């Protein structure tokens, strides 16, 4: 039974959950399976501690997703990090999770630098994932915060995902260094019209870790 598509069944399950627990379940969850990352971005809360980078076991990630679907009746999961495409546990990656739970949809916040043509094709075959690639503005702003050459790797990720037919989004953190750029039409023309982004998430800078540098 696929209650992801059956609105009436989904509503009935929500009401049943409320009767049992006194409140509705969360509509979706945000899961950070690893704090490991291949970048060292200024102000990043996820890697603010350079020495402690925990990773959940595959069994734990599988259990969380299973319970979200079967107990909370959720069909939407947000994957954060760290860098999700660095995750590996028990010989498996998040692609194994995406393919196993093919009746769910996953939004993955990623720096994009690890999205090879092979990964993009696998995302396309699964058909239930959209990557939201983190940017800071244009090449200058992105490389200043994320490291030299990062923007070019992002452009390659966009090309790989476009070629594979995977829906792409962007995520951006507003700071004192890019606020003017985010207010201009050129930014949106570039990412949406030229590169093919279909949506955007904008976040406020969290004042923790190395964020005082941004």
Predicted features by range, described:
Residues 1-30:
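N-terminal [4Fe-4S]-dependent radical SAM core
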Residues 20, 36, 136-138, 205-207:
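Short connector loops/turns at beta-strand edges and beta->alpha or beta->beta junctions
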Residues 23-24, 28-59, 72:
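Canonical Radical SAM [4Fe-4S] cluster-binding loop centered on the CxxxCxxC motif
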Residues 47-51, 138-141, 207-210:
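A short, flexible beta-alpha/helix-coil linker loop
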Residues 50-58, 144-151, 214:
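Flexible, glycine- and charge-enriched loops at secondary-structure boundaries
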Residues 61-79, 87-204:
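Radical SAM/AdoMet-radical enzyme domain recognition
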Residues 199, 205-214:
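A C-terminal junction/extension of Radical SAM enzymes
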